[in-house]
Amino acid sequence: MLSVAARSGPFAPVLSATSRGVAGALRPLVQATVPATPEQPVLDLKRPFLSRESLSGQAVRRPLVASVGLNVPASVCYSHTDIKVPDFSEYRRLEVLDSTKSSRESSEARKGFSYLVTGVTTVGVAYAAKNAVTQFVSSMSASADVLALAKIEIKLSDIPEGKNMAFKWRGKPLFVRHRTQKEIEQEAAVELSQLRDPQHDLDRVKKPEWVILIGVCTHLGCVPIANAGDFGGYYCPCHGSHYDASGRIRLGPAPLNLEVPTYEFTSDDMVIVG
């Protein structure tokens, strides 16, 4: 085949391109060698990575646009003329608009104005809070109909001399006693040293002939019986407490005298309790 390709003349390249070789039985005398690949470069581990040469690529190579330091004033880059630098002059006071002047000269006036605004605000808030608290507390107070029942008018001409009448006042029994002249003199002559809860008769009445008491025993809250007991005043049937005609404890376990409510004589024939 090779000889035919060599004799073909101008067709030799075509014939040689389409030819193929057939392996013979003879072994080659020289072994074929494979070309060696180039070796990879070995890094020098002894060379420090953070060196001037290794960091030179990260260094700034252009002019600085801003710098800040202890002795270096801050600078602004005006490379873009369409960017407006923030100006807070509208929010600053007139005394501190000039940056070349010291603010200590106007500090007293500025502090005084701040204190004035704070004080006025505090007073306003306190006044509003006072009104709110007053309305809240008044909403929990008794209504007008309840306050009307808090006072009771008693016509004294309906109570004969030497008698005791009971009324209901604020859910409690109220005793109104029309004393005789003998009872008045008897209670006024009692020595205070004989009393467990010392109190003179004149200190418990506004008019000697009228005694107004709350009919609740000071021991355990029972209702005493009028015109009874060893002293002719009131007697508690629960535990045997004896009161005189002035409502003072004279005998028994009760520790205190009968309570005297607040009352006022509006006329000779009318008294208002409460």
Swiss-Prot record:
It is found in: Mitochondrion inner membrane. Disulfide bonds join C222-C238. InterPro entries: bc1_Rieske_TM_sf, Globular_prot_asu/bsu, Rieske_2Fe-2S, Rieske_2Fe-2S_sf, Rieske_Fe-S_prot, Rieske_Fe-S_prot_C, Rieske_TM, Ubiquinol_cyt_c_Rdtase_Fe-S-su. Proteolytic processing is necessary for the correct insertion of UQCRFS1 in the complex III dimer. Several fragments are generated during UQCRFS1 insertion, most probably due to the endogenous matrix-processing peptidase (MPP) activity of the 2 core protein subunits UQCRC1/QCR1 and UQCRC2/QCR2, which are homologous to the 2 mitochondrial-processing peptidase (MPP) subunits beta-MPP and alpha-MPP respectively. The action of the protease is also necessary for the clearance of the UQCRFS1 fragments. One of its GO terms (cellular component) is mitochondrial inner membrane. The keyword Transcription does not apply. It is an enzyme of class 7 (translocase). Gene3D superfamilies: Cytochrome Bc1 Complex, Chain I (2.10.210.10), Rieske [2Fe-2S] iron-sulphur domain (2.102.10.10), Ubiquinol cytochrome reductase, transmembrane domain (1.20.5.270). Its main location: mitochondrion. Binds 1 [2Fe-2S] cluster per subunit. Fe-S cluster delivery to the Rieske protein is mediated by components of the iron sulfur (Fe-S) cluster assembly machinery that reside in the mitochondrial matrix (including HSC20 and LYRM7). The chain crosses the membrane at residues 104-140. Residues 141-274 are mitochondrial intermembrane. Keywords: 2Fe-2S, Disulfide bond, Electron transport, Iron, Iron-sulfur, Membrane, Metal-binding, Mitochondrion, Mitochondrion inner membrane, Respiratory chain, Transit peptide, Translocase, Transmembrane, Transmembrane helix, Transport. It catalyses: a quinol + 2 Fe(III)-[cytochrome c](out) = a quinone + 2 Fe(II)-[cytochrome c](out) + 2 H(+)(out). GO terms for molecular function: 2 iron, 2 sulfur cluster binding; metal ion binding; oxidoreductase activity; ubiquinol-cytochrome-c reductase activity. Belongs to the Rieske iron-sulfur protein family. This is Cytochrome b-c1 complex subunit Rieske, mitochondrial. It comes from Gorilla gorilla gorilla.
